[in-house]
C-alpha cells in the first residue's frame, strides 16, 4: 500500500509540474515497512535496569581505582570498559588512572616484558584516550635480518596479530611500522581465518570486516559483549553492568526511534517528497552513531531530523528537480524567509517550510539559554550545502567535469560534515565555549579530513549506481581521472589511499589536544566512523539489506538475556 501511495503521489506531482524530464533515481523502497511504527516500552523495565547499573557501577569503580591491581590488568579492564561503551560512567576515574600510568611508568620498558597482545591492548587504550604512546613499543616484533618484516613466531599468535591489527587503525602519518603491520596482519589474518573456530574466529572475521576503531560504538559494544566472553566475564560487575546497560539503552533507543518516526509521519515526507529515499530508521542510526550515551537522547533525535532534511534535499537536487527549479530552491534557502516560498514550484513549498520550521523550533528551545547563535550557524551550513548541491547539479547539467581540486573543494561542503558538525554544537551547546566555536570556525585538519572521508568514500561506493541511472554524473573518480589522466582503477586506488590518510589525520587530531575538549571531538570522530560503516564496501544507506539491516535488528530487536 505504501508503495502504491508514493507512486500515485509522485505521478500527481509530476502532472502539476508538467511533463518535465527528471533525473529520477528510482531508489529501492524501505525494507522496514511499518515494523517500527508501534514501538512501545515498559518504563518499569528502565527503572529496573537503572538500579542494576547504579549498583554494578560502584563495584566496577572500585576495581578501576584499585592501586594494587597490576598495570596490564588495569589497562585490559579499561579497554573492556571502553569497548563496551561504558567509559562515560567513569570518565574522571579512568583519566586519573591513565594519566598516572602514562607519567609514572616507562611504557617502553614495560612493553619490553609483555607479549604482543598485551602491548597492543596497552597501545590502543592510551591512543583511544588521547595519549600519544609511541609506536616504537612494537619494534621488538620487527625482523631486521630478513624480508619478513615481522618475526615469524607471531604468525602463530592469532590473538596477538588481531590486537596488532586493531592497533594499526590508530596510526597517524609517518608511523611506518604501523603501516607495515597493517598490511602484514591483514594478510595473515585473512589467510588463517578459515582455520579458526569459536570466539577467535568471530573476533577476526568481524575485525577484518569492521575494525573496532572505525565501527559504530553501540554495535561494537554489543558485538564485543558476545564475541569477547572471556574478557567480559573476568569481572562479575563488568558483565552485569554491560548486560543491564545494553538493555537499558535498547529500550531508550526504541522510544527515540518511535518519536522520530512519528515526526516523519507528521511532516508527511512520503507525500511531499515521494521521490526521495524513505530511510528514517536508518537515519536514526546516524543520530545514534554520533551520540551513544543515554544523556544525549535529544541530540540523537535532533541529528536524526537533520539527517532526514539532508537526505530529502540531496535527493531533490540529485534525483528529481530540474536545474531551473534548483536555482529557485537555492535562492529561497539563501533568503531563508517564509515569503520566499511563493517563488517555488508547488511540490517544493512543503519541504522548504519544514526546513524553516524546524529551525524556528530550535530557536525557541535555545533562545532562553542565550544560544540562538548556534541555530544561525546551522542555517548557514544548510545554505552552503544548498549552494554545493547546486554546483554539482550545474556540472551535471552542463556536462562539465571539474578539476579534482575544484571538485574536492565543493565536495567538502556536499559531504554534509559541516551541517552535522553545527548540529552537534547545538546538541552540546551547554558545554560549548567561545574558544570551541573559534576552533570549529577555523576549519581544523580533523574537520577537513572528516569531510574528505565523507565525500570520497561516498563517491567510491556509489559511482557505479549513479552511472547506471544517469548519463552524466560527476564524482571524484571522474574528476581525478580527468585531472591526472589516469584510468578508473588507478583513480580508485589513489582515492582509497586518500581515505586512509584522512583517517591518519583524524587520529592525530585526537591526540594530546588542548584546543578543544574530548567531548566536543567525539561526534566528529563518530561522524567519520558512521561514514566508514555506511560506505566501506558499498552504499549501505541506499541499499541497506545487509549490514544496516543486521545492525538495526541487533540494536532494536535482539535484547541480551538478563543475568
Swiss-Prot record:
Keywords assigned: Lyase, Magnesium, Metal-binding
Cofactor(s) the protein requires to work: Mg(2+)
A biological process term (GO) from this entry: sesquiterpene biosynthetic process
Cofactor: record remark: Binds 3 Mg(2+) ions per subunit.
Gene3D superfamilies: Farnesyl Diphosphate Synthase, Terpene synthase, N-terminal domain
Ligand binding (Mg(2+) 1): 314, 318
Known pathway: Secondary metabolite biosynthesis; terpenoid biosynthesis
GO molecular function: magnesium ion binding; sesquiterpene synthase activity
Highest taxon listed in the record's lineage: Eukaryota
Pfam family, one: Terpene_synth_C
Enzyme class: lyase
InterPro entries cross-referenced by the UniProt entry: Isoprenoid_synthase_dom_sf, Terpene_cyclase-like_1_C, Terpene_cyclase_plant_C1, Terpene_synth_N, Terpene_synth_N_sf, Terpene_synthase-like, Terpene_synthase_metal-bd, Terpenoid_cyclase/PrenylTrfase
Tissue specificity: Highly expressed in leaves. Expressed in roots and flowers.
Keyword check for Zinc-finger: no
Function: Sesquiterpene synthase that catalyzes the formation of sesquiterpenes and sesquiterpenoid alcohols. Converts farnesyl diphosphate (FPP) to 10-epi-juneol. Converts FPP to tau-cadinol. 10-epi-juneol is the major product.
Domain remark from Swiss-Prot or TrEMBL: The Asp-Asp-Xaa-Xaa-Asp/Glu (DDXXD/E) motif is important for the catalytic activity, presumably through binding to Mg(2+).
The name this protein goes by in its record: 10-epi-juneol synthase
Native source species: Inula hupehensis
Amino acid at each position: 500500500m505504501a508503495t502504491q501511495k508514493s507512486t500515485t503521489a509522485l505521478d500527481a506531482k509530476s502532472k502539476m509540474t508538467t511533463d518535465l524530464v527528471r533525473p529520477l533515481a528510482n531508489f529501492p523502497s524501505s525494507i522496514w515497512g511499518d515494523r517500527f511504527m508501534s514501538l512501545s516500552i515498559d518504563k518499569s523495565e528502565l527503572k529496573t535496569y537503572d538500579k542494576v547499573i547504579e549498583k554494578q557501577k560502584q563495584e566496577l569503580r572500585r576495581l578501576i581505582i584499585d592501586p594494587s591491581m597490576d598495570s596490564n590488568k588495569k589497562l585490559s579492564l579499561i579497554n573492556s570498559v571502553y569497548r563496551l561503551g561504558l567509559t562515560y560512567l567513569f570518565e574522571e576515574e579512568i583519566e586519573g588512572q591513565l594519566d598516572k600510568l602514562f607519567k609514572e611508568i616507562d611504557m617502553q620498558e614495560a612493553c619490553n616484558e609483555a607479549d604482543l597482545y598485551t602491548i597492543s591492548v596497552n597501545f590502543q587504550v592510551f591512543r583511544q584516550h588521547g595519549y600519544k604512546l609511541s609506536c616504537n613499543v612494537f619494534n621488538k616484533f620487527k625482523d631486521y635480518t630478513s624480508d619478513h618484516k615481522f618475526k615469524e613466531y607471531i604468525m602463530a599468535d592469532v590473538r596477538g596479530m588481531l590486537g596488532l591489527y586493531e592497533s594499526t587503525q590508530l596510526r597517524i602519518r609517518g608511523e611506518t611500522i604501523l603501516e607495515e603491520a597493517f598490511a602484514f596482519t591483514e594478510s595473515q589474518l585473512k589467510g588463517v581465518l578459515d582455520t579458526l573456530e569459536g570466539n577467535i574466529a568471530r573476533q577476526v572475521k568481524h575485525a577484518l570486516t569492521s575494525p573496532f576503531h572505525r565501527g559504530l560504538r553501540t554495535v561494537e559494544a554489543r558485538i564485543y559483549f558476545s564475541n569477547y566472553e572471556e574478557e567480559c566475564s573476568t569481572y562479575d560487575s563488568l558483565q552485569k553492568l554491560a548486560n543491564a546497560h545494553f538493555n537499558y539503552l535498547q529500550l531508550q533507543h526504541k522510544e527515540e526511534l518511535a518519536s522520530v518516526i512519528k515526526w516523519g509521519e507528521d511532516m508527511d515526507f512520503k507525500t511531499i517528497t515521494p521521490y526521495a529515499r524513505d530511510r528514517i530508521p536508518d537515519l536514526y542510526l546516524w543520530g545514534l552513531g554520533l551520540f551513544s550515551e543515554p544523556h544525549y537522547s535529544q541530540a540523537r533525535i535532533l541529528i536524526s531530523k537533520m539527517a532526514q532534511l539532508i537526505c530529502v534535499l540531496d535527493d531533490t537536487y540529485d534525483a528529481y528537480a530540474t536545474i531551473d527549479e534548483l536555482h529557485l530552491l537555492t535562492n529561497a534557502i539563501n533568503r531563508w524567509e517564509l515569503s520566499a516560498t511563493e517563488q517555488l514550484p508547488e511540490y517544493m513549498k512543503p519541504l522548504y517550510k519544514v526546513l524553516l520550521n524546524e529551525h524556528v523550533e530550535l530557536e525557541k528551545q535555545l533562545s532562553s539559554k542565550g544560544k540562538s547563535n548556534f541555530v544561525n550557524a546551522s542555517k548557514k551550513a544548510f545554505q552552503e550545502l544548498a549552494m554545493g548541491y547546486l554546483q554539482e547539479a550545474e556540472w551535471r547539467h552542463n556536462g562539465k567535469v571539474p578539476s579534482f581540486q575544484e571538485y574536492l573543494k565543493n565536495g567538502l561542503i556536499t559531504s554534509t560534515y559541516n551541517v552535522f558538525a553545527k548540529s552537534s554544537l547545538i546538541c552540546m551547546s551547554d558545554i560549548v565555549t567561545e574558544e570551541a566555536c573559534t576552533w570549529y570556525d577555523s576549519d581544523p585538519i580533523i574537520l577537513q579530513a572528516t569531510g574528505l572521508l565523507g565525500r570520497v568514500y561516498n563517491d567510491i561506493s556509489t559511482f557505479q549506481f549513479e552511472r547506471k541511472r544517469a548519463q552524466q554524473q560527476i564524482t571524484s573518480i571522474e574528476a581525478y581521472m580527468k585531472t591526472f589522466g589516469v584510468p578508473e582503477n588507478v583513480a580508485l586506488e589513489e582515492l582509497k589511499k586518500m581515505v586512509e590518510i584522512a583517517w591518519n589525520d583524524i587520529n592525530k587530531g585526537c591526540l594530546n589536544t588542548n584546543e578543544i575538549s574530548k567531548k566536543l571531538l567525539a561526534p566528529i570522530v563518530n561522524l567519520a566512523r558512521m561514514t566508514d560503516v555506511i560506505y566501506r564496501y558499498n552504499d549501505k544507506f541506499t541499499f541497506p539489506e545487509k549490514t544496516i539491516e543486521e545492525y538495526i535488528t541487533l540494536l532494536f530487536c535482539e535484547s541480551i538475556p538478563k543475568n
